[in-house]
Amino acid sequence: MIPCQRFTFLICFFSTVLFSNLVFGETKLLGAEKKWNAYATKLNKNKTCFITSEPIKTSGKFNQKNRGKPYVFVTNTKGGSNHEVSIKAGFNFKRNKDVIFDVDGKKTKLFPVDDRAWSESSKIDRFLVQSMRRGKTLTIIGTSTPGNKIIDTYSLSGFTKALRLIDKSCS
């Protein structure tokens, strides 16, 4: 397998395992801070914490019945990575189209795979989290497989306090 294909396979595999356990495994609510919720769970004997939020506004051409729920996540793994930023769009992204992560006009490209997207490095994750701490709104702009532009807007109200909850529990 060539490196790029292997990388894509690994991302898909681990994201499926991680998010299926996060969403369907036993999770404990650590707290709710305005528009953000903080959770903890065990994943392969490792404690994993995450904060998540749903959009306050969605626009674009799509059939609501065919779209899953969109979320933004920031994840910490005890003894592992901290502040990993990801999104779940609720639709598959069009291949070779960037996903835009926009905090109050500061735009960053995310790497899409199926219905998820991540930054390309932990350095970019740190930048995104800093922007989210200081920001008011987060806008995710993506293109669906049929080519429709979809925009989800999230409030960052409560983000910093929710992040502190997972930092305390899973750093």
Tell me what each language-model feature is.
Residues 17:
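Conserved nucleotide-sugar donor-binding subdomain of glycosyltransferases
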Residues 1-11:
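Bacterial N-terminal signal peptides that target proteins for export
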Residues 12-13, 159:
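Hydrophobic alpha-helical segments
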Residues 24-171:
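A generic "folded-domain core" signal
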